[in-house]
């Protein structure tokens, strides 16, 4: 049962659709679809369209389609005429953020299948690619792009010119932009990067949503209050955020942190006051307070009130940390897919009437050869140290269907030095075998067929 103060708060801000819903990001008893919907922690996401149909893949709808193994067949499907429904809807989504913030991981989770490379090293994504989600009459087109970086960093890492221009090009075609911030990175989480701010200020007319990633890795959830205030400049959906905090500690409370978020009214009611609240129940292990100290619940809240916004001038980014024009905020956990389900539902609701770009059988615009190269390079980036993986050149020698329907792939990995070759092969061939095994498994999950992958290593002559 909710605390008396919370009951009063919810009653005071009850809208036409009833009291505002309480969201628990962790520790929630998911006895209803409303609780599952609430888990993403969206500010102002509006009403949920209904209980999501659970499947093996994240989000609604059937399993995502496989990618054709033949380059020609895949090209025919991608370039073919879309099977338009009677009233099609579409939404083009650009996901931007600093390098290694989790953009490709989020794209894969939304798609329900891993088609984009993911690595702990920066600049894993080298060029823009599109992922396609088709659900009933709605098509979401995800524009997965390289992390926004500066020309100086691009020169230092010897990056292709496309890695500088692709994120900006994707914004030109986007209907909505997701700005991803890794809140577990204490070096970068307190402000949006200069490149992200430049990109947002260049396209201020495109609706933007702030996505805080890996919130489950924060030991102190109260940090989120300060981060939200910094990254939004205290404004969400045109409303000023007021933060009020009272912290008292209870030695008998559970030794875990629970974040609860109250959702704003649906979009059609946003003309009225639309409060959103964060309540943090926090028990601090190893606290300097004596264990016999009095116990009370901790509470924090974010209220909103209308205010006139100052225009955001292009060129002011150096003096700013955040973006005051986000229309919503989502919080995602690193290891939980339910929050991604809710984000996908939100994106489906944002789609507008318009023709589809792709046939419903399309999962990605990447060719099967590009997917293969990216998956193998992901493993190379993961297992080789420092700059070594960036010097590997991939050459596919064989790509054919075997007698039993399996896909046979032979790829040559060319390295600049003999020492790099020894590193890549590993002791008694252990590392190259591991890379081939893991990459082969990922390719099987993408193409939905047996894969025989052979990797060879040679020194560049």
Swiss-Prot record:
Residues 380-461 form the KH type-2 domain. Keywords: GTP-binding, Membrane, Mitochondrion, Mitochondrion inner membrane, Nucleotide-binding, Ribosome biogenesis, RNA-binding, rRNA-binding, Transit peptide. CDD domains: Era, KH-II_Era. It is a peripheral membrane protein. Residues 123-127 are annotated as: G2. It holds the Pfam family KH_2. This is GTPase Era, mitochondrial. The gene is ERAL1. Residues 213-216 are annotated as: G4.
């Amino acid at each position: 049962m909710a605390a008396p103060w919370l009951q009063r708060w919810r009653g005071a801000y009850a809208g036409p659709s009833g009291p505002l819903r309480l969201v628990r990001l962790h520790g929630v008893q998911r006895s209803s679809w409303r609780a599952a919907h609430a888990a993403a922690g969206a500010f102002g996401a509006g009403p949920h369209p209904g209980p999501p149909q659970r499947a093996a893949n994240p989000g609604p709808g059937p399993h995502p389609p496989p990618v054709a193994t033949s380059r020609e067949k895949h090209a025919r499907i991608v370039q073919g005429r879309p099977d338009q429904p009677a009233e099609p809807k579409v939404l083009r989504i650009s996901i931007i953020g600093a390098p290694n913030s989790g953009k490709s991981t989020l794209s894969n989770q939304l798609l329900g299948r891993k088609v984009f490379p993911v690595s702990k090293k920066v600049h894993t994504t080298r060029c823009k690619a599109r992922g396609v989600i088709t659900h009933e009459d709605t098509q979401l087109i995800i524009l997965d792009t390289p992390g926004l970086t500066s020309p100086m960093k691009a020169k230092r890492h010897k990056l292709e010119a496309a890695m500088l221009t692709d994120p900006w090009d994707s914004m030109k075609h986007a209907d909505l932009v997701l700005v991803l911030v890794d809140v577990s990175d204490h070096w970068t989480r307190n402000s949006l990067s200069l490149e992200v701010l430049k990109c947002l200020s260049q396209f201020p007319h495109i609706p933007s949503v702030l996505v805080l990633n890996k919130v489950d890795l924060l030991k102190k959830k109260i940090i989120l209050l300060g981060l939200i205030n910094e990254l939004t400049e205290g404004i969400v959906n045109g409303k000023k955020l007021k933060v009020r905090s009272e912290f008292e500690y209870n030695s008998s409370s559970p030794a875990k942190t629970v974040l609860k978020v109250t959702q704003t009214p649906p979009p059609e009611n946003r003309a009225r006051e639309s409060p959103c609240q964060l309540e943090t129940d926090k028990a601090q292990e190893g606290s300097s307070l004596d264990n016999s100290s009095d116990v009370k619940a901790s509470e924090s809240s974010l209220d909103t009130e209308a205010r006139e916004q100052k225009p955001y001038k292009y060129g002011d980014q150096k003096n700013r940390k955040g973006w005051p024009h986000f229309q919503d905020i989502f919080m995602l956990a690193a290891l939980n897919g339910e929050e991604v389900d809710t984000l996908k539902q939100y994106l489906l609701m944002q789609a507008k009437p318009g023709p589809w770009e792709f046939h419903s059988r399309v999962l990605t615009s990447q060719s099967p050869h590009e997917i293969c190269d990216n998956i193998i390079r992901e493993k190379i980036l993961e297992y080789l140290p420092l700059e070594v993986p960036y010097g590997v050149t991939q050459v596919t020698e064989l790509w054919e269907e075997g007698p039993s329907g399996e896909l046979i792939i032979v790829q040559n990995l060319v390295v600049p030095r003999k020492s790099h070759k020894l590193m890549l092969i590993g002791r008694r061939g252990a590392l190259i075998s591991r890379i081939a095994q893991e990459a082969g498994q990922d390719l099987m999950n993408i193409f939905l067929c047996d894969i025989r992958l052979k990797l060879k290593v040679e020194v560049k002559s």
